[in-house]
Every structure is written in C-alpha cells, then in structure tokens.
C-alpha cells in the first residue's frame, strides 16, 4: 500500500486533441447528429425540483441529531449536491435555454448553485471553456493537477488523501494555474449564494447549513459520485485522452459519464449523449471504457501507474488572459440603450452646452 507511483512526469504529447477531428467525421457521416444539438427541455424542471427538495431537507433536518445529518449528507444530500454541480456543468453549455439566451443560462446556473452552499456556477463556466478548447494544455486547462500535487501525492495513502481533498484542489487550483480577474457575474453569484446561505442559517439553523456544505464537500471527495473526476481524463491507457463511464451512476450525474461523447459534441445535452453513441457506435465501441465508479477510485489508489501525473499534457498554443467578460454590464448597457437613457443623456449634455454658450455670449 505504501508503494510509490511509477511516473515522474506528465504524459507530454505533440498531437492535437482527438475530439475536433472525430466531431468533423461524425457530422460528415451522420449529419442527422445536429438534431441532438440544443436545449434539454426537462433540465429546468429536474434542477428546480432538486433545489426545492434540498430546501425541504434543510427544514426537515433543522433539529435532527448530528449523526443523522452526516449520514443524510453523505447518502442523500451529497448525491444531490454533486448532481447539481453536474447540472451546472450542463448549464454552462447553455443547454437549459439555448445559446441565444446566455444570461438566462447564467442566472439559472446560480439557481442550481444554491444547495451547493459555495458559489461556483459562473467561475466554473469561465474556466470550463478553456478545458474544452485547450484540453491538456499547460497553464490553460486547470483540470490538470499542479506539479506539487503530482510530486507529493505519490503513494496509495497519499493518493487516498488527495481524493478526499479533491474539492479543495478543484476549487483553488485555477487560482494557482490560471489567474483571471473576477467578473461582475461572479460577484453577483457570490452575493446571491451568501444571501441564500444566511437565509438557511437564519430560518433553519447551523445544522441545515452544515448538511448542505458537508454534502457538497464529501460528495466531491471520497464518494462514488466523485469517480468521474478520475474516469474522465486520467490515463488508464496512455494513447487515449478521454474516457467514458457507462453505468448506473449516470442516472445521478446527468450522464457526465458519457465524457468522450461530451467532448466530441459539447452542445448536445447530457440526456441525449446516449443517442449520439447509438447513432455512431463505431467511433466509441473500440475505446477503453469504465463500468464501475468504485473500481475507478480503487485502481487509481492501488495502481502504481496511476496518480496525478497520469494525464496527457501539451504545450500551450496561446497566452493566458487575465481579464474576464463583464457579461452583466454588457446587458445593462444594452438595456439602457434600449430604453433611451443614453439618448436622454446626450440631449441633456447638448442643452447644458447650449446654456453655457448663451451665458458666454451674454
């Protein structure tokens, strides 16, 4: 169990990620795949039901014993909260309202964020774009572990600890690898989330808030739901960059297990990814796949070939960008233009200048 990992570096590759070329081939061979693009009409209702259910659980557990709260957080709330993080993942691809309504998708992501107790929705979207566009590229894809993680978590006990601490590495790694300016939407996301947490604390007490927060943390660490963090891109086979999981846990994770399919077509909603696989099976059947979340986690811990270094990595194609997109400001500015505020401002300036000129003449 104390055996150290056999890798001492990432798996550096000069090849481009395979997803774009496979996407082009599939679209050319099966043009009907485009019918799967777009909105998941059920997503709004499923997400809203889970948010309301978690608020109900907060009411139900406000006077419960701490042991019951911990058990409920692991077996119930944790599964739901992790599902909400993956709903946010789906929403980040605008599958709730479509690409024509990005602001609606961002606000709906904040709604899905509420039971998680930590503001992640907008920040996740900001970094997830790079994960798809620059998969595995050094300094751009923050899904790849830092050198410290890879150098320190090298034995089975340490890898187990790394899995337990995954929510903290996942949350703070972007601040180390790729610093970006906070955007207006991120600040709004934080304000809304903190306000919700304070309301839970005020009306239901500390036990209910703990139920939400502990459920989020534990479900992203030593929990079957967290198996997808490892299954998606860790190199169980060195010449394959992305892996899919086909098992029952997809029912609790918005089909995030269909990860090869997702990277091939990010704008197909999670619920329709099995249709993509059925439509073009020859592109996916020969790839290594996973069928058990517990097996994924166990093999990662005990197999010396696996560890944080077991990731394909590339040299970056572009430089980092510090400044973010101030999306809300753009919409506010557009709204002010629409209702004529700027025309009124221009008129007032002209009147003011006219008055000043008249006074000078007098």
From Swiss-Prot:
Segments carrying motif Histidine box-2: 128-132
Pfam entry (one): Lipid_DES
A cellular-component GO term for this protein: membrane
Transmembrane segments: 45-61, 71-91, 107-127, 160-177, 198-218
Functional pathway: Lipid metabolism; sphingolipid metabolism
EC number(s) per entry: 1.14.18.5, 1.14.19.17
UniProt-listed InterPro entries: DES1/DES2, FA_desaturase_dom, Sphingolipid_d4-desaturase_N
Family label: Belongs to the fatty acid desaturase type 1 family. DEGS subfamily.
Protein role: Bifunctional enzyme which acts both as a sphingolipid delta(4)-desaturase and a sphingolipid C4-monooxygenase. C.elegans contain specific sphingoid bases, which are unique or different in structure compared to the sphingoid bases found in other animals. Two examples of these distinctive compounds are: 15-methylhexadecasphinganine and 15-methylhexadecasphing-4-enine and this enzyme can catalyze their conversion.
Protein name (Swiss-Prot/TrEMBL): Putative sphingolipid delta(4)-desaturase/C4-monooxygenase
């Amino acid at each position: 169990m104390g055996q150290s990992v056999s890798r001492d570096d990432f798996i550096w590759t000069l090849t481009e990620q395979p997803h774009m070329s496979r996407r082009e081939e599939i679209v050319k061979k099966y043009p009907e795949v485009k019918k799967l693009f777009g909105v998941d009409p059920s997503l709004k209702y499923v997400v809203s039901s889970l948010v309301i259910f978690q608020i109900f659980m907060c009411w139900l557990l406000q006077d419960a014993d701490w042991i019951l709260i911990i058990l409920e957080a692991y077996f119930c709330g944790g599964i739901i909260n992790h599902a909400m993080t993956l709903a946010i993942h789906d929403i980040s691809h605008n599958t709730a309202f479509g690409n024509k309504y990005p602001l609606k998708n961002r606000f709906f992501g904040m709604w899905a964020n509420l039971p998680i107790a930590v503001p992640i929705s907008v920040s996740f979207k900001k970094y997830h774009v790079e994960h798809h566009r620059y998969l595995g590229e050094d300094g751009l894809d923050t899904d790849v572990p830092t050198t410290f993680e890879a150098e320190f978590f090298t034995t089975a006990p340490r890898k187990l600890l790394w899995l337990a601490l995954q929510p903290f590495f996942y949350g703070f790694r972007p601040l180390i690898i790729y610093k970006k300016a906070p955007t207006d939407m991120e600040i709004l996301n934080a304000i809304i989330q903190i306000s919700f947490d304070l309301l839970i604390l005020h009306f239901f007490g500390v036990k209910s808030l703990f139920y939400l927060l502990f459920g989020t943390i534990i479900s992203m660490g030593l929990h079957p739901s967290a198996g997808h963090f490892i299954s998606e891109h860790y190199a169980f086979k060195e010449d394959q960059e992305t892996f899919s999981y086909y098992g029952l846990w997809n029912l609790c994770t918005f089909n995030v297990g269909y990860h090869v399919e997702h990277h091939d077509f990010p704008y197909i909603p999670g619920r329709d990814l099995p249709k993509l696989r059925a439509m073009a099976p020859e592109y996916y059947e020969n790839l290594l796949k996973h069928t058990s979340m517990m097996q994924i986690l166990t093999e990662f811990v005990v197999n010396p070939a696996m560890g944080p270094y077991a990731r394909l990595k590339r040299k970056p194609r572009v430089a980092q960008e510090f400044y973010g997109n101030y999306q809300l400001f753009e919409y506010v500015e557009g709204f002010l233009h629409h209702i004529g505020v700027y025309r009124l401002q221009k008129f007032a300036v002209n009147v003011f200048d006219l008055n000043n000129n008249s006074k000078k003449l007098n």
